[in-house]
């Protein structure tokens, strides 16, 4: 397909990055979208809408947005199920929010889970566009890794006129085709393959019937698609697809949030991945192929912007700086605490943790006191899988043809059993071995000639389940 978007508007000089769950929300995206390209986070957007309604929707904006949804029967059902006048709460904090059913491979088109994903993205887009104004540019950020609700969120955002979609945390090779099918399919059901891990990797197809939500396709936007990547090789590969991205955001390893794994195996003394020459994208090759791209990661100054332009970029993407603004959805007290820490002489200690994220991607951690960056606070947090957005579908080894879900926040014994396929006794043996090693480093035992091969196999499975990538296990 030919090039669909030229990105000539001055707003495209700066893209405000999508962050977290409602950190970059409609307020921030609407404010930045007036003069830049504002992007809100679509991550868990159904849950965001649900909780705002259960908090009593104090500004009235959620109900305002829902009143614009084309199918009012769907909007009314959401209000009946989740809106709480004045945000009234029971005494038991565990019962503060009514939980939605989780997205599964068998989630029906008519389920409240699917409806809330469409409604949430529609509401967030509508409110951001209202704030950005007629000439503003507003986009939605999605994560490839959180694949089950993405198709429904795309539909909701497109119904409300979203201008672009940015997507990383994986290889988003299906999404340009999904956007095309939603926009030009005239109500024909749209499919999207979801990966099922385990022996004999397979996929199942999530289905979406746009006509249930959007009977009038004339009002549907045709957003630009930006793939968020780290290397020119992936850009070249994606650009050869029939439905290719319209542009690319190239993130350096210094970018906040998740990073791509380093191509080398070495770690520094803090356990951080060491990025080398092989991790540096060849921007000349991007220019030679005529691809439009933005640079991201430590690009928040005017000098950084000018340097990006000299390297052939259309502009820059900036995230963390916007997370600290008044308009971001970050908790105000935590935001101020981070700002206070940054302002001190020693600054904020930020490091790249290879194990912290259940996605398997390295993750930036800021050592902020009294948060889960402190091990003691993390350890006392109850492990419960009540949201399930990061669950992974696995082929059940004990029930051929069946799918089970592995949730990184479920009780650790259940998680390790599902992820490794080991028995409780085998897991207990590995835990005992860990306690006997220096610094609890199981990977040292993989080089120990006295350890049986079968035990080493179990250790590898255990380490992979805990989050270490196979490439780092020697």
Briefly describe each language-model feature range:
Residues 32, 308-309:
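Hydrophobic residues within well-ordered alpha-helices
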Residues 1-288, 303, 461-471:
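Active-site entrance/lid segments in N-terminal catalytic domains of soluble metabolic enzymes
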Residues 245, 253-292, 300-303, 310-474:
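Conserved active-site-proximal phosphate/metal-binding subdomains
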